[in-house]
Amino acid sequence: MSQSLLIISRQSPWSGPSAREALDIALAGGAFDLPVGMLFLDDGAFQLAPGQHPAHLQQKDLQANLQALPMFGVDDLYVSARSLRERGLAEERLALAVEVLDDQALRDLLQRYDQVITL
């Protein structure tokens, strides 16, 4: 039986390579049929904001990678309600369908996965 993997992405999509690396790990795990979940926490919630154009920062747009997650079997996608609220992001305007979790649900989520990677 495969061990489940939760990837916590805490960095904004334009602050460096961590956001892309987190997505790459999730996609690779999904490609190998591992049970993978992804949690967008803190500034990682900005990855879910629609209409980003990071080309002027010489960064690649991560939206295509985000949209590919379900195609690779990564269906368990979560975001912190607190992270959304603190960053002024509205759940109904996110670029990807995710489950919004309160603090207690986040603690419960961490207990459900065998391995956790934070980037």
UniProtKB/Swiss-Prot annotation:
Q: Which PANTHER family match?
A: PROTEIN TUSC
Name of the protein this chain belongs to: Protein TusC homolog
Give the species. Pseudomonas aeruginosa (strain ATCC 15692 / DSM 22644 / CIP 104116 / JCM 14847 / LMG 12228 / 1C / PRS 101 / PAO1)
Q: What does this protein do?
A: Could be part of a sulfur-relay system.
Where in the cell is the protein located? Cytoplasm
Q: Which gene encodes it?
A: tusC
Q: Which family does it belong to?
A: Belongs to the DsrF/TusC family.
Which residue ranges run through the membrane? Answer: none
- Region forming the signal peptide: none
> Per the annotation, which location comes first and is thus the protein's main one?
cytoplasm
The organism sits in which domain of life? Bacteria
Which of UniProt's keywords are assigned here?
A: Cytoplasm
An example GO CC term for this entry is: cytoplasm
User: What InterPro entries does this protein's entry cite?
Assistant: DsrEFH-like, Sulphur_relay_DsrE/F-like, Sulphur_relay_TusC/DsrF
User: What SUPFAM superfamilies would the database entry show?
Assistant: DsrEFH-like (SSF75169)
